[in-house]
Regions:
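Charge-rich, low-complexity N-terminal segments
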Residues: 2-8, 12-164
Length: 164
């Protein structure tokens, strides 16, 4: 049985390693994928099920990341081995709890933004775009750097105060 911490943290087995490190798994093909979708049937139980499933699968597959959510938006970053991230994204596209799935960023990286998190949950309290901004099309105008910057800011916030 696989046990995943309820807070979404993971261990360091999947963090990028340097070649030649004794006993470590080297992951040289780290893909970072960010997508946005609209929740279908958003409530606490649905969100809990999504997070539990994501943390279980991500721990198994060496994926880390974060899910920013509220009733009108899911914004998620996945990072890990290319094949595994691609498979996870394909599952998300097929998942009927997500509507209007749109890929915003898909790039190779050497370092993870969330190396310690199988799936960080952030309830989008204040730092994500407002509902009015979303309705006005902020995502259509946002650059990949803008979207990545949101997650880098979240990572800095979590690393500064992990209890927040």
């Amino acid at each position: 049985m696989l046990v995943v911490p309820t807070d979404g943290r993971t261990d360091h087995r999947f963090a990028p390693c340097t070649a030649g490190t004794t006993g470590a798994t080297v992951i040289s093909d780290i893909t970072q994928l960010i997508y946005v979708s609209q929740p279908f049937g958003y409530d606490g139980a649905t969100l809990g099920a999504i997070l539990l499933d994501a943390r279980r699968c991500n721990t198994r597959d060496g994926i880390t990341g974060a899910l920013v959510c509220r009733h009108d938006v899911y914004l998620q970053l996945l990072e890990g081995p290319t094949e595994k991230v691609t498979a996870a994204y394909a599952r998300i596209i097929r998942d009927d709890r997500h509507a209007g799935v749109k890929e915003l960023v898909n790039r190779k990286v050497t370092d993870r933004i969330f190396p310690d998190w199988a799936m960080l949950h952030d309830p989008a309290k204040s730092w994500i775009w407002s509902e009015e901004e979303m309705s006005a099309g902020v995502l259509e105008r946002a650059t990949p750097a803008d979207v990545i910057g949101l997650f880098e800011g979240l990572s800095a916030k979590v690393n500064a105060d992990p209890s927040d």
